Amino acid sequence: MITMSSFKYAGLIISIIISLISCTHNKNYPTAFQPELAKAEAMMYRYPDSALHILQGIQPDIPSENEQYATWALLMTQAQYKNQIEQSDSLINIAYSYFINQDNAQRKALALYYKGILRHESHHAEDALSFYLEAATEIEKTNDYQLGFLINSEVGLMYLYRKLNDYAMEYFEKAHHNAELSDNQTYIAFSFIYIARAFSQKKQYNKAIEYYEKAIKIGQVNNYPTILASAMNETSFLFLKTGENKKALQYAKDCIKIKKTDQRIFSLGDTYRYLKMYDSAYFYLNQACLSPNIHTARSAYQALYYISQHYCPVKVDK
């Protein structure tokens, strides 16, 4: 039976817990909005839309609490990026200017990372790489393994784009190490895909396929269609390189079943072209030509041009 004394006892316990939380100081959060900022950051990776909603409800003071405003500005930058909201660099500049001079490696790394992201998006690749590399140094001082994965992946991708394959591999391996420590299966799968791309660019196709297959396995076990289709699509191309044509065609078909996109329609059509199955190639490449993505459409037209050198589709009179 619940008595009045039971309610008083429960109330006392709750009061003690709240008092303990209030007295516990986390150096990552200024005191005024500590609960809201902590809650938003805790939700950032899994529920970025909810994190954004919380941050939008906070009205920090500007200049009386510099740390408070810098923290809010940094998390708001992160939330907007994760929700694919276009933004200027005004908020990240506030966060960067504050945290770059503080003894907080996690905040410094996060600010440097998003400075790099926004510089990269505005086509300043050298600046972006410089920020990423500095962020990579700072993140090694922390246990934020999810951020460590993201930072090292960006560095690796920039080196891979420049065909600096050994440097790319070094950072992809760091990204994989961080992904494993974070136990984030999505990040682990993408780290395998990135390592596979580096092996592919080094023309070590069998090693690349080995790592793509690891990503595919994670996609299958965890029902991650985006990862599964992406890895299978890229592996299909490598199977053509290694002469495993049946596997190449099957993977290309499976990608369409998982999720049909213009790029995957093109890939299937181009696989048929490579195998000299021109009727099927013509069918899918014509669809890909209608893509609003100029790169996909251009590739499809180019593939059709190559086909025209060997094949003329039969037109039926009506």
For each of these PLM feature ranges, what is it?
Residues I2-G11:
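Bacterial N-terminal signal peptides that target proteins for export
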Residues S5, L20-K318:
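A "functional boundary" signal
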Residues G11-S19:
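Bacterial N-terminal signal peptides
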